[in-house]
């Protein structure tokens, strides 16, 4: 999150808000609720969604964005190099049965028209591309 804020700031853009939804077991809102908030916020022109392997929240948020959001959106999914079936990270995210993989999440995001950064270092560039694609 701090990396995304730093990159956006270095692009000369500000932030209306930064939301950390927390780990898998306990969090204050879903990815979909967060993107809905930013979509409806008049002080937000574009946003970056950061997710991780495990679960299906990013795919659900991507579907919501596809059907409801006209703002530029970029995304990054952490955990692309995580071994299948192994718990990873602070939330103990696990990829099992083909669900929750970084590749599946990235594909769902791309299908929703979201520009996906391959690495954390590319989040700002992905947002710039998303904004350019929307004529900003």
Describe the role of every protein-language-model region:
Residues 1-136:
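Catalytic-core regions of core metabolic enzymes
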């Amino acid at each position: 999150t701090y990396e995304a804020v730093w990159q956006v700031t270095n692009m000369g853009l500000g932030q209306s808000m930064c939301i950390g939804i927390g780990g898998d077991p306990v969090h204050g809102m879903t990815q979909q609720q967060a993107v809905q908030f930013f979509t409806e916020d008049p002080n937000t022109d574009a946003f970056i969604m950061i997710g991780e392997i495990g679960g299906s929240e990013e795919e659900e948020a991507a579907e919501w964005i596809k059907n409801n959001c006209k703002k530029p959106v970029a995304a990054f999914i952490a955990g692309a190099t995580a071994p299948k079936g192994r718990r990873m990270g602070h939330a103990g995210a696990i990829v099992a049965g083909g669900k929750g993989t970084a590749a599946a999440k990235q594909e769902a995001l791309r299908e929703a028209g979201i520009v996906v950064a391959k690495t954390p270092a590319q989040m700002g560039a992905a947002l710039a591309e998303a904004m350019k694609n929307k004529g900003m």
